[in-house]
Amino acid sequence: MGVFNVEDEITSVVAPAILYKALVTDADNLTPKVIDAIKSIEIVEGNGGAGTIKKLTFVEDGETKHVLHKVELVDVANLAYNYSIVGGVGFPDTVEKISFEAKLSAGPNGGSIAKLSVKYFTKGDAAPSEEQLKTDKAKGDGLFKALEGYCLAHPDYN
């Protein structure tokens, strides 16, 4: 098995606690409302905490697909959230799982700094393609910006 790590950092003008609420606490309900391609996020097993399995259903290239998220850590006090994508329809055959470790912290002017570590656990020595890495980053950035946009458009959201 190969392990390939990608680090990313993005800033936001939204305060960390409010952004965490949108990205983590309210994400199951909020994300399908702000991103048309995401149809639903539902808990398959668990109570929302560590060990919970969620099914995220989305439309890509005209096809309905889904991925399974396994929640690894929910740390509201430290604004951290870790999860892994562990399977689903449309999940790459060469990948066992993709793990995400996200943490928000205070940024300039009351905003946030989001740090993300993504680990691709591949089958054999297969490496994720540059195309896959670019596509996955674009999807992640799009999700972040959509939820950030929701917070900015709804100043009473907190």
Curated annotation (Swiss-Prot):
GO terms, biological process: abscisic acid-activated signaling pathway; defense response
A cellular component term, taken from the record's GO annotations: cytoplasm
CDD domains assigned to the protein according to its UniProt record, in alphabetical order: Bet_v1-like
Induction record: Upon contact with the plant pathogens fungus Fusarium solani, Pseudomonas syringae pv pisi, and the fungal elicitor chitosan.
Cited SUPFAM superfamilies: Bet v1-like
Domain of life: Eukaryota
Gene Ontology molecular-function annotations: abscisic acid binding; protein phosphatase inhibitor activity; signaling receptor activity
Pfam families: Bet_v_1
Alphabetized UniProt keyword annotations: Pathogenesis-related protein, Plant defense
PROSITE patterns in UniProt: PATHOGENESIS_BETVI
Keyword Ligase in record: no
UniProt similarity note: Belongs to the BetVI family.
Protein name, as recorded: Disease resistance response protein Pi49
Native source organism of the sequence: Pisum sativum (Garden pea)
